[in-house]
């Protein structure tokens, strides 16, 4: 793909993303709707869970830079209608469970109830179908879902939004039963969920944005002690009909200013940045705001230059890639990931071959190459550091903040956010030409903090929670 195919693209030495031929081995996946990178076993490589709209769902393992399909299990759920995925350690055993949101935004009601798959041996069991879930009553299908550890205990709940009903926050109670804690948490508001994002938007606490596919959207400010207060109107987020499809809380100026980026199915995309009082102001530059039929969002440092890129996946029109250049978000050439005629549904980035460079996975409802597209980055060699914080139980600490200082400049990541699914639960930092990290700070959701200093680059660090036994940071075995 020539760089001239992207109007206004700045020169950076050629297209950034190159297509992998035969991305998936051992399975045909004609269509895909959601992606989740999950830790399905202790000390095992991350798996890529693929939601398939008409089943079966698949689990793929990275092998030699490609993706190898594992045998079908209960998670395949061939009669399901997967639309979104989330991954987190629900029961505190150090392994992540998978929530499958089986809602269909084109229908008032989903065809199939949601699932919560718990890895057991070589298979899975659906916790929502067991007697422990009886107190939940009927569990309808959802359109979007995110993990939420509201008490910082390492046991995550799942916050799910469906077709105009109240938000649900499904947690495991102290007796191993399941309950809906949304009312207790202050989250039981009505919404037709189209997008979710969690992070420290309005302060140091964990804030929750629920972008509505139709009707008013919600913004919950963390109030401490596992509770939230809805502040959309007072914070300046009163958009009557947002039409949200995906969202992320990101470093809006690559200098430490948090912002909320929301993609819309119609109308200009929006980037809200809070002022010192917590009032949000819309500040999307024209290059970012330009309307498109957006379906999914990815924010990651793809070329390891120390600045993140934004990939906007669009239905039936070219995908867009923006990079932070000359103190602003500028379009660059996505290369083979332009995909001008496909119908992308989700995007994820992960280091699948262990070389310190991210690969990009695009799920598609249709398009050339089937349901999964795999892309590698074509860019100059740069240094990097990858950080994998763990909960006290040893699972990925999704939602933790990781801040790095290298060459006098800081970068911050929120662990594990992803588009219509679960992102890689690793804080990936490009370092450009810098080979030494001065300082690394990790803040867990319970307020615990660890600092590591004078770290060499080009390595992955697993960082246990301070309360965990054997809490020294280490590289993967």
What are these regions (language model features)?
Residues 295-299, 303-316:
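Loop/turn-rich, solvent-exposed surfaces of beta-rich toroidal or solenoidal domains
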Residues 54-55, 107-112, 162-165, 212-215, ...:
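Short, solvent-exposed loop/turn segments at conserved positions within beta-propeller repeat blades
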Residues 2-9, 24-28, 280-282, 290, ...:
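Gly/Ser/Thr/Pro-enriched helix-cap/hinge segments flanking short amphipathic alpha-helices
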Residues 32, 82, 111, 140-142, ...:
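Short coil/loop residues immediately preceding or within conserved phosphate-binding loops
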Residues 46-52, 98-102, 156-162, 206-212, ...:
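Hydrophobic beta-strand segments that make up the repeating blades of beta-propeller
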Residues 32-41, 46-47, 81-97, 141-151, ...:
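Beta-propeller blade termini
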Residues 1-31, 46-49, 58-80, 115-140, ...:
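Blade-edge motifs of beta-propeller repeat domains
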